[in-house]
Amino acid sequence: MPEERESDAKARRITSLLSISHDKDVDGLNSAAIVWRYARAKGLDFKAILTDYGSFEQVFLTIGKQRNTLVIITDLGMDETILEVVKTGLERAVSRGCRVVWLDHHQWSERAIKTVLSLENKPVLKVNHDFCAAEIAHKVLMPRDEICAGLARIAHDTDFNLREIESATALTDAVNVIRFGAIDKKEEVTDSLYPVLEKLAESGMSGVWDDDTHKFKDSLLNKRVDHYRKDKAKKMRKALAHHHDQIIHGKLVRIVEIPSGVTSTDMGTFASNQEVLSSIDPELKVADLLLSLSQGGMLGFRRGRDGVLCNAAAKLFNGGGHPYAAGGEYGLYEDFQAVSDDIFLTLSKNTNWVGEV
């Protein structure tokens, strides 16, 4: 009956937006802020979940419980190991009147792409390795919004490790401070980052950063960031002093242990500064490939110069990413020297990671 069809259409009308984004860096945070501005522009109720790859199962279980919701996922690649969990969650959400938009810049398999594009209700998948996720979100969702354009510029500076914008570098440290603090206190990372996310969505960087004073508007956050910077510099110098090096296929490969409270991005930037290295050891040179090993057995890959493909190296350790930066997993370990020897051996048996971009 016409009345029933009209009622059904109203019931399936999108009324809210759920943002799922990466919690580890500025790109994920700014992507969520851009999505929030989109929700406001469309008059949709907004909720965000900031997460990481190890939490996909719970996140997609939550997605599957949504109804009449636009689900926008940003700065997260498809985790092949739980592809079926992702598929089940998305299919259930779509069956309940939801629509899926996925915006990302990581490497995707054909199977993962088909999983998203085969969904009902006109799914959108945009994957582009030339941009960070916030830039993609800006171009797809809010191309004429100046605040979103600014958020995308900040994210690009951090995600491509340019370090040309002072406020972008500061925001990176702020995200780390807040995230590590939440983890230490066993609090939800999303809840801890929400105040900053909300200010970014409202006013862009001017909501949290003062260009005149070169400081955060939140004085307590400023103090936390200052302390974090001093503390991590000490930790990274100590970690670099105990590095392991080996020449493999003509490339200098270096492995360092990441101390707690330091990210692989921090270590990658620190260890690529020749002045810093020379102050530790005059003979220490920037490595062609730097591997940062976390206490939990996760691997970060950063290159010191062209001629190395981090994503190809990470693939050898169940990971992936970009030519200039990537992530993988070694697993829990006890002996750093034994792990280094094993990693060096694995890299020596493969040449795919050696080559021009």
What are the functions of these language-model segments?
Residues 187-227:
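Long, charge-rich alpha-helical interaction segments
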